[in-house]
Amino acid sequence: MPYIPMPYVVEQTHRGERSYDIYSRLLKDRIIFLGTPVDDDVANVIIAQLLFLESEDPDKDINLYINSPGGSVTSGLAIYDTMQYVKPQVSTICLGQAASMGAFLLAGGAAGKRFAVPNARIMIHQLSGGFQGQATDIEIQAKEALRLKAKLNEIMARHTRQPIERIERDTERDYFMSAGEAKEYGLIDDVFLHKKAADKKPQ
């Protein structure tokens, strides 16, 4: 994979020039960007950012932008639980794609504050993974996978207001949606062309 240099932003302050990497500068505006697969390292960074922004201002919304193919279920659940735990409401915005755990996090934003741009793609499916080891270990892992699957479906049903039976059926295979279809499904609340459309939503 080619090396992509980190963009920096230079600002003038009363103490002179100050430079920020682009993600730190966005964080100043309460913007968090998830633009990679979800794993423990990514989850730890996003959780730390959520907790930091809560400490900075517990009453001001946080904006989580998502362009992710998904990833680890446990890592994603750690981010999701933190989104629900912090006092600020977390608005989610899909750019590009929100697939698998990315779609789960998109749906987990604050009610009325979940968005996607018109050409975004959203995909939900059941968790996947291979089991290895002795027969008893495989049985234990399979039971845990079924428990996690049921938990994810339950949470998704609550956020989308879809019957649990439909969530179970639709996630049996990859289920792709356009931004408009995701709105009808209840994964997001609105589709917008311009940022000002999201800014007009009630705080």
From Swiss-Prot:
Its EC number is 3.4.21.92. The lineage of its organism: Bacteria, Pseudomonadati, Myxococcota, Myxococcia, Myxococcales. This is ATP-dependent Clp protease proteolytic subunit. CDD domains: S14_ClpP_2 (cd07017). One of its GO terms (cellular component) is cytoplasm. HAMAP family: ClpP (MF_00444). Pfam families: CLP_protease. GO terms for biological process: protein quality control for misfolded or incompletely synthesized proteins. Keywords: Cytoplasm, Hydrolase, Protease, Serine protease. Cleaves peptides in various proteins in a process that requires ATP hydrolysis. Has a chymotrypsin-like activity. Plays a major role in the degradation of misfolded proteins. InterPro entries: ClpP, ClpP/crotonase-like_dom_sf, ClpP/TepA, ClpP_Ser_AS. Fourteen ClpP subunits assemble into 2 heptameric rings which stack back to back to give a disk-like structure with a central cavity, resembling the structure of eukaryotic proteasomes. NCBIfam families: clpP, PRK00277.1, PRK12553.1. It comes from Anaeromyxobacter dehalogenans (strain 2CP-C). GO terms for molecular function: ATP-dependent peptidase activity; ATPase binding; serine-type endopeptidase activity.
